């Protein structure tokens, strides 16, 4: 049976993290940084460590328990326990870039994407390839790698979850190209389906297929609506990747609104 998150639970989780913020004063003292974590106007804790000086972004888990400090450019991600005011783990990359770091909606797992790993490298990939992975926050153990062998679609910082928290969808557009979307199990990291590029209409100047630039899963995770680079929307079976229907072309604003409605209502 699929677990559906009650609206009240979702609102409480949202409120829990909405009041939290991390302020980092760099080079105070020189060569270090001081971080103050707030709940509203209340200071929860303060920390001063050299590792904080390279932090470029911070994220809280939906329930407010965890804080991620991301050091993109220095190649590591810190995980902090906000209740204890302690750093519990530092995830180390082989190289300097951090491409993505996100919590799952239930705050029980963590998605990370960086090149290789100084702890347990994936023998299937060269160290310089990104190796996106899913982690269990209770055990601080890696659950699985979240990419397919074709390297067509994988987590690299853009993820959307079904409302029930069971499935997640990845798209990876960048400044140069966009590819297919993909659907994964958000609890186990198991690959489910690839959503192919959408062929251009007959007579179009472009050839091949349009790549995905955004996606949303239906509340039950059984369908996925994909927005392509030409602002067409297409709906798919999320378990098989089978095309159900092409909804047509929309303005950028309308396409975004359609995606959000689909995520809320499944239509």
Swiss-Prot record:
Gene3D superfamilies: YVTN repeat-like/Quinoprotein amine dehydrogenase. WD repeats lie at residues 50-90. Keywords: WD repeat. It comes from the Bacteria. InterPro entries: Quino_amine_DH_bsu (IPR011044), WD40/YVTN_repeat-like_dom_sf (IPR015943). This is Uncharacterized WD repeat-containing protein DR_2484. It comes from Deinococcus radiodurans (strain ATCC 13939 / DSM 20539 / JCM 16871 / CCUG 27074 / LMG 4051 / NBRC 15346 / NCIMB 9279 / VKM B-1422 / R1).
């Amino acid at each position: 049976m699929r677990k559906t998150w009650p609206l009240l639970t979702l609102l409480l989780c949202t409120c829990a993290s909405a009041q939290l913020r991390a302020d980092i004063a760099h080079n105070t003292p020189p060569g270090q940084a001081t971080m103050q974590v707030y709940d509203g106007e209340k200071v929860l804790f303060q920390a001063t460590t050299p590792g904080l000086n390279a932090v470029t972004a911070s994220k809280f888990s939906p329930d407010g328990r965890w804080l991620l400090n991301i050091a993109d450019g220095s190649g590591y991600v810190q995980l902090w326990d906000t209740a204890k005011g302690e750093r519990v783990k530092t995830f180390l990359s082989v190289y300097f870039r951090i491409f993505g770091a996100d919590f799952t909606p239930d705050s029980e797992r963590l998605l990370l994407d960086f090149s290789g790993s100084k702890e347990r490298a994936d023998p299937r990939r060269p160290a310089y390839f990104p190796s996106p992975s899913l982690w269990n926050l209770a055990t601080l153990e890696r659950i699985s790698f979240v990419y397919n062998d074709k390297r067509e679609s994988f987590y690299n910082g853009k993820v959307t979850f079904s409302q029930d928290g069971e499935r997640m969808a990845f798209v990876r557009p960048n400044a140069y190209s966009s590819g297919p979307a993909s659907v994964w199990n958000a609890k186990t990291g198991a690959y489910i389906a690839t959503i192919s590029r959408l062929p251009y209409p007959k007579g179009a100047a472009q050839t091949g297929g349009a790549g995905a630039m955004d996606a949303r899963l239906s509340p039950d995770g059984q369908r996925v609506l994909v927005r392509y680079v030409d602002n067409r929307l297409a709906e798919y079976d999320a378990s098989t990747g089978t095309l159900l229907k092409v909804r047509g072309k929309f303005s950028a604003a309308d396409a975004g609104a359609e995606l959000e409605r689909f995520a809320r209502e499944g239509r």
